């Protein structure tokens, strides 16, 4: 027993043990499973109450970003760059459009509706993202899946990120510019309460 009171459990499944080879056709392989836990304050995370600051960075990942893999170098570099710049996280940008956060999905509130990028090869469809979309629909909060450009992001009234370990995390500053009034907005608070 690990005595974990609050935190996360990470499960990773591999193709199994074999000689180094890119051939996945070997049917005799048995998948390997790695599970570990990590203590982390999730439910009473201070950032969820006061918000975080983020920057935008180029999205340098491979083309199939919708596949969850252990190849997280670009995301790690993006997060590290953000911390070195004195902020909490980064959003990954390609061709002027926001894809997602280094380990999260992104939502904005603009023109009386919530917007999040559509599922595509450019983003990993998160469990929390999916739940937030459903909760918005059930609670008659207008939500639209479409591309978000830099101008949309910078002119949004509210911005928030979602992830399995961060739930609904408000963003109060993007690229040194205050989001809305610089405080956690009413829409984000409502989504947090619903979630």
What are these regions (language model features)?
Residues 1, 14, 19-195:
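Helix-start/capping segments and mature chain N-termini
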Residues 4-12:
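Ordered, amphipathic secondary-structure segments that act as subunit-interaction surfaces
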């Amino acid at each position: 027993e690990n005595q974990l009171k609050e935190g996360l459990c990470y499960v990773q499944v591999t193709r199994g043990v074999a000689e180094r080879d890119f051939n996945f056709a070997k049917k005799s392989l048995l998948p390997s499973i790695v599970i570990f836990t990590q203590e982390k304050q999730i439910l009473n995370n201070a950032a969820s109450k006061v918000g975080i600051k983020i920057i935008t960075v180029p999205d340098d990942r491979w083309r199939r970003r919708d596949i969850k893999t252990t190849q997280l170098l670009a995301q790690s570099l993006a997060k590290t760059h953000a911390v070195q710049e004195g902020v909490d996280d980064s959003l990954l940008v390609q061709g002027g459009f926001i894809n997602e956060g280094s380990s999260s999905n992104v939502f904005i509130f603009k023109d009386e509706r919530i917007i999040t990028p559509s599922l595509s090869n450019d983003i990993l469809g998160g469990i929390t993202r999916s739940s937030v979309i459903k909760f918005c629909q059930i609670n008659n909060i207008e939500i639209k899946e479409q591309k978000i450009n830099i101008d949309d992001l910078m002119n949004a009234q509210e911005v928030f990120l979602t992830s399995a370990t961060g739930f609904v995390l408000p963003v109060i500053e993007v690229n040194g510019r205050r989001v809305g009034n610089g405080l956690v907005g009413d829409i984000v608070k409502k989504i947090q309460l619903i979630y």
